[in-house]
Amino acid sequence: MQERVLVGLSLGVDSLATALLLKAEPFSVVGVYFHLHQEAKDLEKVRKICKDNNIEFHYVNLQEEFYKDVIIPFADFYLKGLTPNICSYCNAEFKIEKLLQYAEKFSCNYIATGHYARKNDSLIGIAKDSWKDQSFMLYRLSEKQREKLLLPLGQKMKDEVKDFVRQCGYEEIANKKESFGLCFTNGKHYSEFLLEKYPELKKLENGKVFNKNNQEIGTHKGYPFYTIGQYKGLNCEGKQYINKIIAEENAIFVGEKSECYFSTLRLNSLVFSQNIENIELNTQYLTKIRGKDEGSFATLREISSNHSIIEFSQRVFAPMQGQDVVVYDENNFILFGGRIESFS
């Protein structure tokens, strides 16, 4: 009897390739379309693809839960003066967790997604296609989530995936322009999205901008709309780069671009993929501070269950409080990750 795998489906090339690859292995593939936000404009097309390929299909409306469990926390991060990587949060706390819940409901042995990341037992690592690598946004997954997760695209290049989907007869989907940015903002900048949801943020206009001598040199539109390293959108003379944000005072501090480089990061909210006892202090590890970052080596100075301190040999540009950092072992599998608490 074939094992059943639940695949989260959209009309994207990656999720479609995932379902078709697993069906060819063979698994008994079950497709689920999670309606998370806005209109479910691709629903009927996804349903037809499943019917044409003899894939069991389910539709689940999760709009209310997604708003409560993802969009509100997303806004809360910014209101605290933090810069979230909401995709890693959403994957662990919502999407993968919901897939597991519905896998049990639909009697599936595994779940699968179209993320580009390698898998070895319960470890997740950098994809073969390093440019498309999405391991960064999966670092917060629990061991239970990782054990049940299949990642069939981890050993494939993006062009291979597109060619496979074309060969399966879905030229239009293979040629579809890739979407970037947040899935729930409908192409809008996050600041515009926040203002729509929280119009009271207009009250933060005319916040003060200070230089390194604490002199007031201009104004800004409100601290939630800015991040470290940003220079656009400030009402002050010259090209000034943000190097500090004090949310409680609605205050922003600026200076030269060189003042936005830092070498030491303190992390909190740690999630471990490997045993902490096997992680060595004063050792250099490949470290990513952004999803599309190729990574650079940082030395681990402190580690506990609650916090970590890492030091880069070359300073990194614009680390931000709340931002994720992921640390990899010598084989490019995730050791642990966390959120930036402070930097210096």
State what each model feature region is:
Residues 1-139, 159-160, 166, 242, ...:
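ATP-dependent adenylation/nucleotidyltransferase module used to activate substrates
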Residues 2, 112-118, 124-344:
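AMP-forming adenylation/ATP pyrophosphatase catalytic core
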